[in-house]
Amino acid sequence: MQQKLFIVTGHVQSVGFRFFTLQEAGKIGIKGYVKNRPEGSVEVVAVGSDAQMAAFRNWLQKGPPTSVVCNLIEQSYQGSEQFEHFEIRR
């Protein structure tokens, strides 16, 4: 299983990005969370298999039709939290 931290920049807040990300994570089987960051980006922590992560990464690069993704930063997630599902955090 891979554990990744993604930072998504662009026009990604107030456009339903978190809701659509929640839906897509559910379809793919990703666990973790999505939340808005104070500076206007969106943070996503994702846990899944190689195939699940590849599909989720591809989706995050495009985002929902209501958003404009300018950049996707990907890092290994160093946290110790165990995720049972995918959720929106505030």
Swiss-Prot record:
<protein>
    <recommendedName>
        <fullName>Acylphosphatase</fullName>
        <ecNumber>3.6.1.7</ecNumber>
    </recommendedName>
</protein>
<keyword id="KW-0378">Hydrolase</keyword>
<feature type="domain" description="Acylphosphatase-like">
    <location>
        <begin position="3"/>
        <end position="90"/>
    </location>
</feature>
<dbReference type="InterPro" id="IPR036046">
    <property type="entry name" value="Acylphosphatase-like_dom_sf"/>
</dbReference>
<comment type="similarity">
    <text>Belongs to the acylphosphatase family.</text>
</comment>
<feature type="active site">
    <location>
        <position position="18"/>
    </location>
</feature>
<dbReference type="InterPro" id="IPR001792">
    <property type="entry name" value="Acylphosphatase-like_dom"/>
</dbReference>
<dbReference type="Pfam" id="PF00708">
    <property type="entry name" value="Acylphosphatase"/>
</dbReference>
<feature type="active site">
    <location>
        <position position="36"/>
    </location>
</feature>
<dbReference type="GO" id="GO:0003998">
    <property type="term" value="F:acylphosphatase activity"/>
</dbReference>
<dbReference type="InterPro" id="IPR017968">
    <property type="entry name" value="Acylphosphatase_CS"/>
</dbReference>
<dbReference type="InterPro" id="IPR020456">
    <property type="entry name" value="Acylphosphatase"/>
</dbReference>
